[in-house]
A protein has these predicted regions:
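Alpha-helix/helix-capping structural signal
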Residues: 45-46, 124, 180
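C-terminal lid/capping helical subdomain adjacent to the catalytic/cofactor pocket in oxidative enzymes
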Residues: 6, 160-193
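Residues located in well-ordered beta-strands
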Residues: 13-16, 69, 137
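Helical element adjacent to the flavin cofactor pocket in flavoenzyme catalytic cores
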Residues: 1-38
């Protein structure tokens, strides 16, 4: 990203936006102001927080999605397995770990720590599909927040504020769709359509 002219500023919180006469002028941050003619909001589960700073209400809710990874085993899975009715997915990493997840906590939250009942549900569904999973030790779990749109469809569009663009509401598919969403979002911003 660096070689393409992108600056990634870590631990830098957005505190507001500079909007004048319906046109975006910049972003206010904990490390100073950044002037820009075009700004894209693509912030996973924090979209509503930033939208509220702009007096916008979006049709998305923030939820926690958990995942876990097992000890490594010999290669057995070269694709992603999903079970929609059970809210479960599984793939195998290059190191042989089984990466699993799928269900979300049943309430809106910005917390990034999971709970055991949700993880148990995911693993129960996984074992029902692939019984060999019951023999594996889980090495770690983690959670991350994401935007969920009401119909499960992502939102990539310009807003009523000239120069401000949205990429949100990806639900379960955000990580898997990141490459395509990046190209689409870049096109939307560059072409303003």
């Amino acid at each position: 990203a660096d070689s393409m002219g992108v600056d990634i500023i870590q631990n830098c919180e957005v505190t507001g936006f500079d909007v004048s006469n319906g046109v975006i002028k910049g972003v206010k941050t904990s490390k100073g102001n950044i002037k820009a003619k075009k700004i894209g909001l693509c912030v996973a589960g924090s979209t509503n927080i930033l939208a509220e700073m702009l007096n916008m209400t979006l049709p998305v809710e923030t939820h926690l999605l958990q995942a876990c990874v097992s000890e490594p085993i010999k290669p057995i899975l070269d694709h992603v397995v999903t079970f929609g009715a059970g809210h479960f997915y599984c793939s195998q990493s290059d190191k042989g770990e089984m990466v699993m997840g799928g269900d979300l906590d049943g309430y809106n939250s910005y917390a990034q720590r999971g709970n055991l009942p949700t993880l148990q549900h995911v693993l129960t569904e996984g074992i029902a599909m692939m019984p060999f999973l019951s023999k594996l030790k889980m090495l770690r779990t983690w959670g991350g927040i994401m935007d969920m749109s009401m119909d499960g469809s992502p939102i990539i569009d310009k807003t009523h504020i000239k120069g401000l663009y949205l990429n949100c509401g990806w639900c379960y598919g955000g990580f898997k769709a990141t490459p395509a969403s990046g190209w689409t979002f870049a096109h939307t911003i560059a072409q303003d359509r």
